[in-house]
Amino acid sequence: MEIPEKLKLEYLLALDTHIETVGKENKEGTMKRIFEITREIADLGFGEKDIHEIAKDEDLYVRYETWRKSKNI
């Protein structure tokens, strides 16, 4: 079983948004979203190692950029 692509893309988007966000209150909101997605992934039975692999997957980043552009995000 693999983490659903949609969750992987949402996780990367949440990370990007957090990095780009300015201000403590805004950072708290983006961090909350990262935790929500992490919880969804964990609820599917995946662990910390699986979540770390998302950020290391270069092919996923290519698909992420294409997805982000197609969604105008």
Task: For the regions a language model picked out, list residue spans one by one.
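N-terminal acidic leader/helix
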Residues: 1-28
